Every structure is written in structure tokens, then in C-alpha cells.
């Protein structure tokens, strides 16, 4: 029997799981995914933590302890999420060691309410880096205009960064420049480049969701272009990756021991039930990439994914033709990606607010029970 996930790994794609929970950690499920499903990393976000904390009783003891200490909700949130991420870092540490720090990484996101505040994002990133205190940690920072200098500064301080919420190739170019800037400054500061790493999380399925919604309003022949924008956009991002990491600026950094910032495909579950559930995995295969998936997508690839080798390089002309055709139809690419960035931040802010409200209720309940 073939193993599509093994084939995906052999094609140069690092498979990460886009989920975390104390249940997954305590039952050994994450360790099993590493052992049996070729998973070599973990990503998290406020929505994932919200579902985990609301849906499990395994957080109650820590919540009671936090209530006794009288901490506020922000400190409680930081403690709860850092605990899980630190645990996940320990589970993935053998992968980190075996791959010389390339994989075995776990990501934790800064408070999304700080997405447009550079200095606050830097301060939060430092706090999380110190709190989790694991070499295989990534701090997730959104690729907003205000996030770009924060990304560079964190890297300059030796903090490994997962740049999130990238939707456009133009913003991706800016992210790579911020990465170069940060690594150059890290070298000047004498940081250990063997420990410093970064990935750039390029969001995929949401692009199709937004573009397809606009195509449906146009109707007619425009509908033939549905479900094509996201893969084309990601393929052109990989072309940018190849171009930027072939420049003399990068070659000078690589000569000093720097590692490239890998493209990471995020938002890879299909939102349209009419599409193949492995679409954003099998169509985005190329060496040196990461694909982070919810467990449902991971299992779908394992069950019936067809890995055809490299499905990115060699498709650049087709990808550009797709975006050109969409522009001819009146699809404003910049407006699409600006909308997605704004909505992406808003969604994570909303999830964080909901999570904070749930934790507040839990803290108050624990305090009432203690007072009886």
C-alpha cells in the first residue's frame, strides 16, 4: 500500500498539523501523528485555542490555580496557551534535533489585537519567547504593514518567527525583505544562526473563497475560473521565493550560515465541498515548502491523496495567465488581498475576544467555587 504522506515528505514538503489541544497532547495523539503520519511541526492560532479550551475539561486544574493566584484574563490566556505550546515543543523536540532545527517547530501567535502596533507586537513576542523558553518555538506575527518591522526586529534579537496572514505576492516580497533585514542584524549582534529560523505562511483557500464569490456575481463565462485563483497565487509566491533566494543579498547571508525562510502553505482545507478535499496539498508540492493542515485534511491526503511530484515549478506561466484572466474579468487582485488581510486580522481578533470571554467565565467560576 502506498503512503501519500510519505510521498509528500519525499517530495520535499514538511507536513505540519494545524491544531493543538491538551487532549491531543495528554493522550499521545500528537506523538502518534509524528510517528505514523509524517507530521514534523505544529501551528496554532486563537481559533484553535478557543476550541481546545472551551471543549475540554483538562484545562480546569490550571484555570483553578490561575484563579487562586488572582491573575487577569490576559495573563491567564498567556499561561494556558504557553503551557500547551511548551508541551508540544517537547513532543516535537526529537524531530527538531534530527533535522538540525529545520522541522520540529511549534508556533504560538501574538495577541492579534496588536496586529497594527509594532512596538506592542515586539514586546509580546519577547514575552512569549521567554515564557515558552524552547529553541524550537516560532512566534507568529501577522504580515501587516506594522508587523513587518516587528518581524525584522524579532529576528534581529534571535527570535524565530512564523510570519502569518500573507495573501499577496507583493506583501510576501516585503516579508522576505524584512527577513533579510532581520537576519543581517542578527549576524551583526552575534546570534547563533543555527537556531534562528523563519517560515512565511501564505494563506491559500481563503483566496478562492473571496475570488469565487466575486466571480459568482459576474456569472456567465467567468464561472469557469472558479477555484483557480488560490493555487495560481501560491505558485507565483513560490516563484518569488526562488527569485529572492537566488539574489546576491541572500547568498551573502547563506555563506554566513543563515537558513532560508521557507514558504508555508496555510489555510489548506477546502471550503467549497464541491472541490477535492486534498486540492491545496496535492497542487502545491515543491521542495523546501511546509504545508500545515487540519487533521481532516491530513487524513484525507493519507487516505486518497495522489502525489504527482512537483506541481509548482513548471506551472508559473499558467498561474500568471490565470491571474491575468481574472483581472480582465474585473477581479481586483489588490482589493481581494487587502480584504483578506483585514478580515483575517478581524477573525483572529474575534476568536481572541471569544476565548478571553470564555477564560474570564472559567476564572470567575473557579473563584466562586473557592469562596464556598
Curated annotation (Swiss-Prot):
<dbReference type="InterPro" id="IPR018225">
    <property type="entry name" value="Transaldolase_AS"/>
</dbReference>
<dbReference type="InterPro" id="IPR001585">
    <property type="entry name" value="TAL/FSA"/>
</dbReference>
<dbReference type="Pfam" id="PF00923">
    <property type="entry name" value="TAL_FSA"/>
</dbReference>
<dbReference type="GO" id="GO:0006098">
    <property type="term" value="P:pentose-phosphate shunt"/>
</dbReference>
<dbReference type="GO" id="GO:0005975">
    <property type="term" value="P:carbohydrate metabolic process"/>
</dbReference>
<dbReference type="InterPro" id="IPR004732">
    <property type="entry name" value="Transaldolase_2"/>
</dbReference>
<comment type="similarity">
    <text>Belongs to the transaldolase family. Type 2 subfamily.</text>
</comment>
<keyword id="KW-0704">Schiff base</keyword>
<dbReference type="GO" id="GO:0005737">
    <property type="term" value="C:cytoplasm"/>
</dbReference>
<keyword id="KW-0570">Pentose shunt</keyword>
<dbReference type="InterPro" id="IPR013785">
    <property type="entry name" value="Aldolase_TIM"/>
</dbReference>
<comment type="pathway">
    <text>Carbohydrate degradation; pentose phosphate pathway; D-glyceraldehyde 3-phosphate and beta-D-fructose 6-phosphate from D-ribose 5-phosphate and D-xylulose 5-phosphate (non-oxidative stage): step 2/3.</text>
</comment>
<comment type="function">
    <text>Transaldolase is important for the balance of metabolites in the pentose-phosphate pathway.</text>
</comment>
<feature type="active site" description="Schiff-base intermediate with substrate">
    <location>
        <position position="140"/>
    </location>
</feature>
<protein>
    <recommendedName>
        <fullName>Transaldolase</fullName>
        <ecNumber>2.2.1.2</ecNumber>
    </recommendedName>
</protein>
<keyword id="KW-0808">Transferase</keyword>
<keyword id="KW-0963">Cytoplasm</keyword>
<dbReference type="GO" id="GO:0004801">
    <property type="term" value="F:transaldolase activity"/>
</dbReference>
